[in-house]
Every structure is written in structure tokens, then in C-alpha cells.
Amino acid sequence: MKLNTKYHGCIEYEEKDVIYFQKGIPGFEELNKFIIFPVEDNEVFLVFHSIENEDIGIIVTSPFNIENNYEIQLEEEQITNLKLQDEKDALVLNTVTLDSDIDKITVNLRAPIIINIKEKIGEQIIINSDKYKVKHSLFKEEA
């Protein structure tokens, strides 16, 4: 199958690559099917893209690229919804807000996207803690 994206050209994918989000994601609740693919010539960023709306693609990264000790505690309901049997099956990604000024690029560490890579289902959760910021600076040390 092919997806003609607004910013990343034509992307080929297979049905097995599609990740289903029952509730969508905040701001895009009507979109339930996404794929993930690498940003060209970049090992840190990925594109989290809707296959239902070719204009909706979000840059994401692993939180472990930013915070070595990043930890989240999923609630039982979230574990059940995601059908997680083993934490090794969980892929954790965080959204990136880009800016032409590199010092203003931020990562949302408070609302990770959790994906069960075996079952191909996902959910974006909100961490109820001040430990992580919604706008964590990616390249500049926090004051």
C-alpha cells in the first residue's frame, strides 16, 4: 500500500505495519490508524503518521534519547487496553515540536505514546506527575 504524505513523499507500507489507536490521540480522536517510519537521514526521529489523513504526521522520538532514566507507570486499565503481557513488547515514543530555532525544539515527556509492538495497538497517555514536562527542551539545558 502507498501513502502520499504532505511532507515525506510517498511511503510504502503493509497492513501489518498499521498500529490501531482505539481512542485516536488527543487532538485527533477521529484518526485511529497510524504507521511509523524513520525520518530520512536521521537516527533519532521517526514519523508517526495517520493513514486516514495524509496531512497528519507527527515527529516522535524515544524518550530514552533524551532522559536515560525515563520511567512511566501504566495503570492496570492501560495495560489491559494495550494487551501488554511483557514490558519488552512496549514501544514508548514522545511527540516533538519543531522550530526553526534549534534551541526551541521541545519534546513532550508528559504524554508518551505507548505501542504494543506485537498486537499493533497503541494509546497516548498523560502522566499525572510534575516529574516530566510537556515542553522539555531537546538541545538546550533547562535553566
UniProtKB/Swiss-Prot annotation:
Its main location: cytoplasm. The keyword Chaperone applies. InterPro entries: Flagellar_assembly_factor_FliW, Flagellar_assmbl_FliW_dom_sf. The keyword Translocase does not apply. Interacts with translational regulator CsrA and flagellin(s). HAMAP family: FliW (MF_01185). Belongs to the FliW family. This is Flagellar assembly factor FliW. The gene is fliW.
